[in-house]
């Protein structure tokens, strides 16, 4: 049974519709509806009386934020490419990022070496100033103090913080709480949280899938399947085999309809094309620039970096999904 909406003034009905569908925030709704609060019925209660009178509780949904939702939908359904700017200096980092953007990347990742060498409070504002329209991700590899680190990224103009899923649900929730705070403060900038699942450490596949589910339950927006750089340098079989691809497919098959799944860690063009045919859409270009080895190529001239990046994007985007 639903409460009688006809007993409410039309102005209240209009306010409720606007609140439910996004044009006004909670504060504006309460201010407007407060004019109609009578008999001890608060504006908040007015809003509650407009909801269906159902006893079946629904799980709490994430707060909607249109700018963030658009990015997530793109990551899930369209080809997106991220460059990991894993260098030590701001000068080189800016040059690599500019070349990659010219090559067509969707997201610029301020890599962990750059953030640790130069400092978050220096790198993030510098990249935002130079690349005002770019989606900026900070690969913080956070293991604790998640709220503090997320605040530094968002305050500097970053769009996405990437932390280690190994940190657990409490850190994930702390980061997501700060994300939500910044979303409420501004509608224009996307604010997202990605969790990196480090493999082989967090393998095998069954364990990695469980971790992915826990991260989504904690509120993160997307997960990355990240082949650890030390591991792939120590064991060449991780590169020669399709270990990363197998892990990524397993996770994508289980959560890919619910959230974007990125593939990270020395990804080659051939691997990325195979994953694209399996339906995956979010890829990270590492220092090897899509070549089937572990050699970093960020010391190449910018025009060469741009050529490698553009080639990676063109090759992978042309892969047809298997039916």
Q: What name fits each language-model region?
A:
Residues 23-24, 44-78:
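C-terminal segment of N-terminal export signals and the immediately downstream linker at the start
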Residues 65-135, 143-145, 300, 304:
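Conserved N-terminal beta1-alpha1 strand-loop-helix module at the mouth
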Residues 79-85, 108-110, 136-140, 161-163, ...:
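Hydrophobic faces of well-ordered beta-strands that scaffold small-molecule active sites
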Residues 145-153, 205-215, 267-282:
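Catalytic cores of alpha/beta
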Residues 26-38, 42:
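N-terminal export leaders
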Residues 156-239:
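Conserved anion-binding
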Residues 1-28, 50-52:
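N-terminal secretory signal peptides
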Residues 290-322:
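C-terminal helical cap(s) of enzyme catalytic domains, especially alpha/beta-barrels
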């Amino acid at each position: 049974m639903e409460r009688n909406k006809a007993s409410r003034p039309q102005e209240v009905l209009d306010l409720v519709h606007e609140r439910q569908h996004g044009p006004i925030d909670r504060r504006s709704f309460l201010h407007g509806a407060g004019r109609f609060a009578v008999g001890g019925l608060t504006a908040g209660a007015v809003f509650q009386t407009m909801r269906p009178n159902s006893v079946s509780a629904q799980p709490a949904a994430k707060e909607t934020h249109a700018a963030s939702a658009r990015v997530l939908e793109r990551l899930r359904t369209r080809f997106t490419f991220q460059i990991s700017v894993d260098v030590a200096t701001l000068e080189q980092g800016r040059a690599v990022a500019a070349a990659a953007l010219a090559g067509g990347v969707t997201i610029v990742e301020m890599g962990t070496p750059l953030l640790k060498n130069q400092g978050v409070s220096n790198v993030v504002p510098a990249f935002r100033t130079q690349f005002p329209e770019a989606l900026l991700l900070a690969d913080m590899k956070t293991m604790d103090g998640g709220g503090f680190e997320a605040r530094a990224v968002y305050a500097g103009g970053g769009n996405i913080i990437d932390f280690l899923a190994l940190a657990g649900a409490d850190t994930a929730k702390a980061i997501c709480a700060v994300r939500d705070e910044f979303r409420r403060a501004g509608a224009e900038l996307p604010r997202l949280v990605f969790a990196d699942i480090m493999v082989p450490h967090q393998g095998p596949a069954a364990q990695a899938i469980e971790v992915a589910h826990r991260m989504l339950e904690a509120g993160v927006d997307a997960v990355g399947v990240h082949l650890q750089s030390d591991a792939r340098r120590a064991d060449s079989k991780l590169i020669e085999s399709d270990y990363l691809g197998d892990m990524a497919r397993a996770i994508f098959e289980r959560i890919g309809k619910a959230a974007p799944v990125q593939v990270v860690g020395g990804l080659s063009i051939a691997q990325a094309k195979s994953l694209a045919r399996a339906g995956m859409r979010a890829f990270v270009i590492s220092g090897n620039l899509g070549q089937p080895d572990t050699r970093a190529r960020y010391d190449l001239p910018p025009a060469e970096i741009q050529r490698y990046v553009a080639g990676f994007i063109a090759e992978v985007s042309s892969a047809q999904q298997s039916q």
